[in-house]
Amino acid sequence: DGHARVSNYQSRFPRVDVEEILELDNVDYSTGHIDFPGTVVVRNAVLDGFQVRARGDIIIEKTVSNVFLKAEGDIILSGGSVTRNSGYIEAAGSIFARFAQSSSLLAGHGIYIQEVSMHSRLTAGQEIIVEEGRGEIIGGDVLAGQRLKARKLGTKMETGTRVTVGVDPDTFQKLREMDAQYEDQKKTYHRVLLHIQQIEESRKRGKASQEDEETEKRLRMVQQKLEKHLENLELQRERLIASINPVEGAEVEVREQVYPGVEISFGVGVRKYRVERRSLPG
């Protein structure tokens, strides 16, 4: 169904645009992957392994896991994200989520998390804000173009948490392309592992054919190549981040505590915290 809205277009008469909205109960085998020229609203869940692409926004009521989401607008996750490092979420605008755990989130503007980010890769062109509720960033790799705000960074367990701020637009675009390539290769890698696992299960049941054995050999070679490629992409990303010259006005604001194990980088300068801090020195 289309939703009407009045455009701010400057003319003698207001122009009415129709914004396409697709509303679904779930995204699963009954719907298949979704690629829609407007906004997609999912009232319940997106089943693991499925993709949702939208030229508008994506709004999902329940927690997402191993899914691929890409929107040219914003992404709103009412239930949060637990992608277990095998899903990928990208918005040209902003991402809003209740929490993120072992997730990869990339936003052109901002990432806004209500409760906590745990062991996640967060990348935003402008800002990352985790201030409501617990307001904690625990573990993971967090990169923001201009600013980061949180209540707490790290934990008393000295969980390694890396924060980088002050990324110029050109470098951010390179990181975005690199991350997209990494996630694409990782999806292929997981498919290869799944196929190998299926052959191993067939062998245990005594049903593996000679063709299966030959296929496994080829898959093992592909697995090794993909592992090296993924490792190389990670190294390239590390080098790119290490070469960043921070933009003017980049800032990190922590309202309560910075724990040991946290690294904060403004470009090439890295500050490591070995003792607990109740305020973040400038």
Task: Specify the residue positions occupied by each region the protein language model found.
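Extracellular/lumenal glycan-associated surfaces
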Residues: G145
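Hydrophobic alpha-helical bundle architecture
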Residues: I111-Q114, E127-I137, K149-R151
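Charge-rich, low-hydrophobicity low-complexity segments
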Residues: D1-G108, I113, D141, R151-K152, ...
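Conserved short secondary-structure elements within globular domains
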Residues: T123-G125
